[in-house]
């Protein structure tokens, strides 16, 4: 029972961890997280906070502070924050420009307000941030897309 059983146990743990990490990657980053019966209403919502450099800076402060978004999405918005490492599926990667072209501000707001079933995304309004702060954060999230 000595070294061989320990070795087999370590190999099994490494294989399980590897499979978990591969499975943690988001399968379809363009898939909406708003339920089908609510998506039209979410898409119709317009961001009341102007997308100005000042508001983007405020959004960054909220993303990295009060909103705690960086914990899962990472400071660079890549979905690689310290808490995001254990989530399956992984948090959204806001540097994915295809995601930003596909999803409307109202959809992002809906997820911030209601959370997203089957993911680690919890409702942040009103427990952590206000509706206005959520819209401000969305302006900052949009700034992660640098082209494409």
Task: Report each predicted region and the residues it spans.
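Short microdomains enriched in Cys/His and/or Lys/Arg
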Residues: 91-102
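Sequence/structural segment immediately N-terminal to covalent heme-attachment motifs in c-type
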Residues: 54-78, 84
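Short glycine/proline- and charge-enriched loop/turn segments
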Residues: 40-43, 86-93
């Amino acid at each position: 029972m000595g070294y061989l059983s320990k070795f087999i146990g370590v190999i099994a743990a490494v294989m399980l961890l590897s499979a978990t990490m591969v499975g943690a990657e988001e399968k379809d980053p363009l898939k909406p997280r708003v339920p089908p019966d609510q998506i039209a209403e979410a898409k119709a919502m317009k961001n009341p906070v102007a997308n100005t450099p000042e508001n983007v800076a405020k959004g960054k402060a909220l993303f990295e502070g009060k909103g705690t978004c960086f914990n899962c999405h990472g400071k660079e918005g890549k979905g690689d924050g310290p808490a995001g490492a254990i989530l399956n599926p992984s948090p959204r990667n806001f540097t994915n420009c295809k995601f930003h072209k596909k999803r409307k501000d109202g959809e992002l707001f809906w997820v911030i307000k209601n959370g997203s079933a089957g993911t680690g995304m919890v409702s942040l309004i009103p427990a952590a941030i206000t509706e206005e702060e959520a819209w401000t954060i969305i302006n900052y999230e949009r700034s992660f897309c640098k082209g494409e």
